[in-house]
C-alpha cells in the first residue's frame, strides 16, 4: 500500500525542497521558466546511481560507484538548465556546510566538512529564455526549503519539463511493504519527467505508466475521438536533449552494492511509463538513497554464495520499479500548462 503521503518523504529522514522562477507570460524562447529540486537527508544516506540515457548531464556520479571510497551522500540535486544548471549544486553545498552537514575532515574543527551532493540535469533551456537557468542561489534556497511536505507538477526542476509533446513535471509515489522478507519497509520515488518519448498511448489517451496498476486506479478513462485527434496532432518534441531523472529512497539497511542494484531495477518503471526510454536523446538517471532506519527481519537461510539480504532486496527492487512508474504518472497528471505547452489534464479532462 502507499505511504501516508504517497511521496518520497514517506521514507523517514528524507526531505524535499524546490526553488524556481516562472513568469506568467513565459513562452518557448522568452521569460523565466526553470528551477531545481533538492532531496536532503540530514545525517546522510547510503547512495548509488544508475545512468542509462545516452545524453546524461551529471555531477559526482563517479563517487557513488560501489568500488570507490565514499559510501554516503548528504543531498541530491535535480535541476533544469542542462549542464549550466549543475551550478546549483554549489549552493546546496554552501547551505550544507553552513549547517555542519558533510564528511567531517578535521576532528579539531567540526566546521570543516565536505558535503557530498551528486546531481543530474534535464534539458529545459528552450522553455523560457535560454539564458535564464538555475544558479547556486537556486540550490541554496531549495536546500533551505527542504521539508516533509512539498508540491508536485510544474514546480522546481519540473517547471520547464516537457514529456514528449505535452507538459512534464515532478511526481512522487511510495509503497509500504505489508508482508514478505521486507515487511514494514518503505520504498518511494520522486521523478522529473522530461522525456523525448511519449507518456500516453495515442490509441486511447491512457498513460503508459497506468498499465501495471490499471487506469481505473488513477481515475483514468479512454479519451474521446475528438480529444485524441487534438493530442495526436501536437508537434513532436524537437529538442536534441531531454531526460527523465529522479531519486528512489528506502529506509532499508542497504550497502552500496545493493543500493546500486535497486537503482538499476528502478529503471524498469521508467521504461514502463515512457516510450521510448533510455534513448540517445535522453540522459535518464536514477539515484538511490538508503537511510537504513528500518530493522531487517531475520532472513531465511540461503546458500553462502548469496548475500544475506537477497530476498529483501528482491522485494525492494520490485517495489522501486512500481514507485517510479507511479511517480511519472503523478508528474504528468499534476503538471499544468505553461508557455503554450498543453498539459495532460488539459488535453484529457475526463
Question: Which residues are covered by each model-predicted region?
Answer:
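A structural signal for small-residue-enriched, beta-sheet-centric alpha/beta enzyme cores
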Residues: 1-90, 94, 98-350
Amino acid at each position: 500500500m502507499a505511504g501516508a503521503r504517497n511521496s518520497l518523504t514517506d521514507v523517514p529522514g528524507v526531505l524535499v525542497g524546490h526553488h524556481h522562477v516562472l513568469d506568467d507570460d513565459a513562452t518557448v524562447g522568452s521569460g523565466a521558466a526553470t528551477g531545481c529540486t533538492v532531496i536532503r537527508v540530514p545525517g546522510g544516506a547510503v547512495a548509488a546511481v544508475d545512468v542509462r540515457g545516452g545524453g546524461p548531464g551529471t555531477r559526482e556520479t563517479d563517487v557513488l560507484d560501489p568500488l570507490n571510497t565514499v559510501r554516503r551522500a548528504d543531498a541530491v540535486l535535480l535541476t533544469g538548465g542542462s549542464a549550466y544548471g549543475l551550478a546549483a549544486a554549489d549552493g546546496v553545498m554552501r547551505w550544507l556546510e553552513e549547517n555542519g552537514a558533510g564528511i567531517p575532515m578535521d576532528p579539531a574543527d567540526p566546521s570543516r566538512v565536505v558535503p557530498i551532493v551528486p546531481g543530474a540535469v534535464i534539458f529545459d533551456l528552450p522553455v523560457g529564455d535560454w539564458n535564464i537557468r538555475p544558479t547556486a542561489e537556486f540550490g541554496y534556497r531549495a536546500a533551505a526549503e527542504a521539508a516533509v511536505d512539498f508540491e508536485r507538477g510544474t514546480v522546481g526542476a519540473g517547471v520547464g519539463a516537457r514529456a514528449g509533446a505535452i507538459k512534464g513535471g515532478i511526481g512522487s509515489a511510495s509503497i509500504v511493504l505489508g508482508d514478505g522478507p521486507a515487511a514494514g519497509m518503505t520504498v518511494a520515488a520522486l521523478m522529473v519527467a522530461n522525456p523525448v518519448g511519449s507518456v500516453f498511448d495515442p490509441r486511447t489517451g491512457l498513460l503508459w505508466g497506468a498499465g501495471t496498476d490499471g487506469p481505473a486506479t488513477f481515475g483514468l478513462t479512454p479519451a474521446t475521438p475528438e480529444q485524441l485527434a487534438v493530442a495526436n496532432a501536437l508537434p513532436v518534441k524537437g529538442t536534441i536533449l531531454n531526460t527523465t531523472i529522479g531519486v528512489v529512497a528506502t529506509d532499508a539497511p542497504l550497502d552500496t552494492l545493493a543500493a546500486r542494484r535497486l537503482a538499476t531495477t528502478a529503471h524498469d518503471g521508467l521504461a514502463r511509463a515512457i516510450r521510448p526510454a533510455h534513448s540517445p536523446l535522453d540522459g535518464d538517471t536514477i539515484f538511490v538513497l538508503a537511510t537504513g532506519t528500518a530493522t531487517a527481519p531475520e532472513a531465511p537461510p540461503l546458500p553462502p554464495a548469496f548475500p544475506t539480504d537477497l530476498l529483501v532486496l528482491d522485494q525492494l527492487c520490485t517495489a522501486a520499479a512500481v514507485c517510479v512508474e507511479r511517480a511519472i504518472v503523478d508528474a504528468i497528471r499534476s503538471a499544468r500548462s505553461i508557455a503554450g505547452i498543453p498539459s495532460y489534464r488539459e488535453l484529457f479532462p475526463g
